[in-house]
Amino acid sequence: MTLHPAFARRATLAPAAALATGAALLLTAFSPAGPASAQDELACDAEPIVMTTADGIDFVRTPDACFTELPDWPYEPDYVEIDGLRQAYVDEGPADAEVVLLLHGQPSWSYLYRKMIPVLADAGYRVIAMDHLGMGRSDKPVDIESYSYLGHNERLQTFVEELELTDINLFVQDWGSLIGLRTAGLVPDRYATIAVGDGARPGLPAGCGRVPPVEDPDVLTDLQFTGAQIPPQQVPFYDGCEPILDTDPAYFGDWMAYAMTAESFMPSVVVEAMTWFDLPPAEEAAYDAPFP
């Protein structure tokens, strides 16, 4: 079955919301599964091929063609296979050097650290920037049940173990902090230092439960993302925009539905709204690259 063009972008963008929501849009209308070799040769705008792990998890993989000639991004990815799904990362600097592990948030990917990676590598560190499941060049399960907060935690812990990383200098941002801080707390002996940028510790106020699901996303009007209403590089995004910082679970439910279903949603819109310096169009396109 082929996706109607009106829904194609929603489908491939769905995992961008998964990191923050612990869920992804249920996708059932992709073409039949194909071999990984066929996937690797796809054009960037080709219809996704669904592949299946040995455990029966259906997933898609962003074609390599989507990541060519990105500005300030000369890095080739490495991969660790965890439960049949590829976890992508870049690994720069001396292999035996002190480790800096960089964790991005939502809806970005390791491209977020394009300015930091060369500086840290030139300073003599081994720099590892990982893409969370459903983000960047990592595999993207199509079932909403394949994403969870604890699942991201467990994958990160396995990733660290597979690479045999110790004495880690951890830098976390946004949802990378919620994932990374909990993981570091579970195995503190593996971590030497921790730095947090635009992040928070994991936890819920007393009495808070699971965010209620949106009952009918199809009737949700195209939620106006608050950041899009603010001129770029404006401090008031943090100081005066109460809706985006609203703690009402219902608002977060609306954000979930918007990020997973709205055709107007693009990662670059969110990143641009929260970036002090103006982003050139080529860099905005690079943030969107994983979700053509």
PLM feature spans:
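Flexible "cap/lid" subdomain of the alpha/beta-hydrolase fold that forms the substrate-access gate
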Residues: 40-76, 86-87, 92-93, 99, ...
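Hydrophobic alpha-helical packing residues
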Residues: 101, 120-121
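Boundary at the C-terminal end of the N-terminal hydrophobic targeting segment
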Residues: 36-38
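Structural cue for short, hydrophobic secondary-structure segments
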Residues: 102-105, 129
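A fold-wide structural signal in alpha/beta-hydrolase
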Residues: 121-131
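The serine-hydrolase catalytic nucleophile loop
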Residues: 106-117
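Bacterial N-terminal signal peptides
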Residues: 15-32
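Bacterial N-terminal signal peptides that target proteins for export
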Residues: 2-20
